[in-house]
């Protein structure tokens, strides 16, 4: 599928929020609206990230803290439908956090990352891998046997990682040693993401552009 417009991205983010609101308050899984644009009915991978806004009264500024992130790496569902299910799962099923409560809805922002189909990274030796990855452009999936780890493109940017660190943390996410990528036998996939995020809880939605390193 092609790139989404700002309006389509805003629809997805608002759909993610409404899905979580309805699920937490009424235990109901919503359906995509009947007037959902055709572009949002195409199958696509998608991740929904929920971040809690924490205000430091002394510094007089806010920071964001992860509250949940779950999604579909592969295009297995229509985008709008996948966004609904990913949003609910991010709010209630992320094993790193307790399920969200309705009172938290006014203190979190929603981010939707629409993914391209993951493509395998061809390499002959592990030393080639860092040169085949662009921080700010690529997200990573690493696989070794049944182990699998995924990191979105914005994670490497937010953490200030270089390609080697990105690979190492993707391995850790898969439950492997951080240097597993250096020993061969690892399947590595890369993908890109178009990112839309609320600027404030229930506020405007903007597209986030990452700086490619």
Swiss-Prot record:
Pfam families linked: AMMECR1
Domain AMMECR1 span(s) in chain numbering: 7-207
Disulfide bond annotation, renumbered to this chain: none
PROSITE patterns per record: AMMECR1
Leader peptide range in chain numbering: none
Domain of life: Archaea
Protein name as annotated: Protein Tpen_0748
Taxonomic source organism: Thermofilum pendens (strain DSM 2475 / Hrk 5)
Lineage: Archaea, Thermoproteota, Thermoprotei, Thermofilales, Thermofilaceae
